[in-house]
């Protein structure tokens, strides 16, 4: 396929491109059409657009780009690209201040998060969702299952399969770029879950709602049973399906168990069905997991799901650190992305405790960006190591302004420097005149150094 694809690549100017009739980014890629989104991504990543086309056609890269999201600045997720990060926000029953959530949106955009997921789960969410899509250049994701109860003002068990599908279409019409759909939790997976006891059962919010719906109605998962209808909707609007992991582990005890792996196998089968319809796929993954299991899990996903992009929550590597789960998550995320994860969902210090505030959100974004960048260095992503090398040069030269400009959080770096002023400017208050960098620079230049005298010679 690769060779035939290379032979079929051809380019169109903008006028000619607009005449082309393609349904999705994957459809365009298979036909050798260069979309404006592909051009944007090639420029951002600094790679040949031919490589983007090849990977999108195979499914190893996804471009979440709803036809109705007009403010989108497209990003690619997958093989050979920078590791992307997602920020979760949204309205809950206990915290339903729309303006406060919109402030979080602005913060996420300012901090250059590539994706924002609206996880609103209370009331009529469409107004907030539409405002989010209108103002955001970041790709937008949702979980339609969360919205169903408020959308219909019905109890969960009374919502029909058709109504659940209608919620998906509503989100698609609104311009959502990717949707988490828990299509892998079928009746077979439910029976495996029942036979294999867990410490923490099902911790996925959408997965638990879907499990409850299936049990209360004694029916098959509607997203699995009617997956072709889901594909119809996603093909129409070019929505990327983020196949949700309802059985992701909620504790390190439950990781890599029968329920998790069974669902992952089903997600692989659904991936092939989606690609046959030119619908793009991202696979969602764990979760809570000990360090020694992460590499294996990344390789399993790539094998069982045919190298589809992998989107992970953490993984959180220990369960004992509430208030610090941005750290437990960043540790796991760096390892996961090194071994194949393409997309990291941020975790904040508020995880497991409350809805995050703006400060929590910033801490979570920075921690996740550090994890993503560390993995990109290890993976050899273009430009990743150069950023660190520039910082090292600035440190050697004791160029504080350059260091601040290069810092992943320059605001915090400037604040720390300002709050603790050294005796001499070419040092900091940790070492003062004993600064190794300062003294080596002087000696290497043939100069004398002093530690006790007030002035240098």
Curated annotation (Swiss-Prot):
The keyword Cell inner membrane does not apply. GO terms for cellular component: cytosol. Zn(2+) binds at residues 288, 352. It catalyses: 5-amino-1-(5-phospho-beta-D-ribosyl)imidazole + S-adenosyl-L-methionine = 4-amino-2-methyl-5-(phosphooxymethyl)pyrimidine + CO + 5'-deoxyadenosine + formate + L-methionine + 3 H(+). Gene3D superfamilies: 6.10.250.620, Radical SAM ThiC family, central domain. The keyword 4Fe-4S applies. Pathway: Cofactor biosynthesis; thiamine diphosphate biosynthesis. Its cofactor is [4Fe-4S] cluster. This is Phosphomethylpyrimidine synthase.
């Amino acid at each position: 396929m690769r060779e035939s694809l290379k032979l079929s690549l051809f380019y169109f100017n903008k006028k000619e491109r607009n005449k082309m009739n393609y349904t999705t980014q994957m459809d365009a890629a298979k036909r050798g059409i260069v979309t404006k989104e592909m051009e944007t991504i090639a420029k951002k990543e600094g790679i040949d657009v031919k490589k983007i086309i090849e990977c999108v056609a195979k499914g190893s890269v996804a471009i979440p780009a709803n036809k109705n999201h007009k403010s989108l600045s497209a990003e690619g997720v997958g093989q050979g690209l920078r590791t992307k990060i997602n920020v979760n926000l949204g309205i809950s029953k206990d915290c339903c201040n729309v303006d406060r959530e919109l402030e979080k949106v602005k913060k996420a955009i300012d901090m250059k998060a590539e994706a924002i997921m609206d996880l609103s789960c209370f009331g009529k969410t469409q107004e907030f969702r539409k405002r989010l899509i209108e103002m955001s250049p970041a790709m937008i994701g949702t979980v339609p299952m969360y919205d169903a109860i408020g959308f219909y003002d019905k109890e969960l068990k009374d919502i029909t399969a058709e109504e659940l599908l209608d919620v998906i279409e509503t989100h698609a019409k609104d311009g959502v770029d990717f949707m988490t759909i828990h299509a892998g939790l079928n009746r077979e997976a439910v029976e495996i879950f029942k036979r294999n006891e867990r410490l923490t059962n099902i911790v996925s919010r959408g997965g638990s709602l879907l499990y409850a719906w299936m049990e209360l109605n004694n029916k098959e998962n509607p997203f699995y049973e009617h997956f072709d209808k889901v594909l119809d909707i996603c093909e129409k609007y070019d929505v990327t399906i983020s196949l949700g992991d309802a059985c992701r582990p909620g504790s390190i005890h439950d990781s890599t168990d029968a329920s998790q792996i069974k669902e992952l196998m089903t997600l692989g089968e659904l991936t092939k069905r989606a690609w046959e319809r030119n619908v793009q796929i991202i696979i969602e993954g764990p979760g809570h997991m000990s360090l020694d299991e992460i590499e294996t899990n990344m390789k399993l996903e790539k094998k069982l799901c045919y190298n589809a992009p992998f989107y992970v929550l953490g993984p959180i590597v220990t369960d004992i650190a509430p208030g610090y789960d941005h750290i437990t998550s960043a540790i796991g995320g760096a390892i996961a992305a090194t071994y194949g994860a393409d997309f990291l969902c941020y975790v904040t210090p508020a995880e497991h405790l409350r809805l995050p505030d703006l400060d929590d959100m910033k801490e979570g974004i920075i921690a996740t960006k550090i994890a993503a960048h560390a993995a990109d260095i290890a993976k050899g992503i273009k430009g990743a190591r150069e950023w660190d090398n520039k910082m090292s040069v600035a440190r050697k030269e004791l160029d504080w302004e350059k260091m601040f400009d290069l810092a992943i959080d320059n605001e915090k770096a400037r604040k720390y420097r300002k709050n603790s002023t050294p005796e001499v400017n070419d040092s900091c208050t940790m070492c003062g005149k004993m600064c190794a960098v300062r003294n080596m620079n002087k000696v290497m230049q043939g100069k004398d150094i002093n530690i006790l005298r007030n002035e240098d010679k």
